[in-house]
Amino acid sequence: MKKALLVVSFGTSYHETREKTIDICEDKIKNSLKSHDFFRAYTSNMIINKIKKRDGIEIDNPIQALDKIYEQGYDEVIIQTLHIICGEEFNKLKEQVDGYSSKFKKIVLGRPLLTHIEDYQEAVEAIKHQIPHMESNEAVVFMGHGTLHESHSAYPALEYMLRDNGINAYVGTVEGYPEIEHVIRRLKEGNIKTVNLMPFMLVAGDHAINDMAGDEEDSWKTILEENGFNVRVHLKGLGENSYIQDKFVRHAVKCAENAKFYGIGAGPGDGSLLTIKAVN
């Protein structure tokens, strides 16, 4: 039986950060499932088009990759996402994958980084390894991408668990809630003087480089400094954290072992799984 492994991420057009994040995650997952042939897909058509125009390199979107896998006669497909939450991008991918359920003997989709409580706990433990020692008047501020999808609650849930584990952390988002002004109000209420600014994104790409750490007047760094905070920028994506990389590997392996199609909702039989349908 021919088996394929498809690793899906939002993608990035930054070579160096891709090599430190997406490429390493892909390699680790590939090495954990050596019986499967590897394929890659990005969900961002904007990034796909930019790379094609700039570098002459063609990267498939999920539909193109699945069509290619089907045309090459594969029987089984394991898909592992590198998305952070079960947001719009992941749910779009989930719907796309569901459309191929009748074309393969087995097609399974691994969950994003943050899905159920255990994921948050493991992510917090991983994050501890990248947070510097902080004084009582210091905090870490994470910039998440954010979403208008109902999964936006993942961000305050993450912050709650970080703080419950003794990490003086605040989580804001570029899109959705909470935004930087909400974070600043709470930083002032907490008498914070120094902010360690980090992206809560797989890669330190455009949002992190420009919206978070840029020198423009609307960047988080500039806004925080104008509000009187001493800002230390840590331009390192989650995908550079080896513990986060290994977390995605565990999701892929568990996905392969359980042969479940992951989505949002309680899974039958095993409460640790989130499924929308089981695929034979």
How should these model regions be labeled?
Residues 1-258:
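Active-site-proximal alpha-helix that buttresses catalytic centers in soluble enzyme cores
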Residues 259-280:
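Glycine-rich, flexible N-terminal cofactor/catalytic loop recognition
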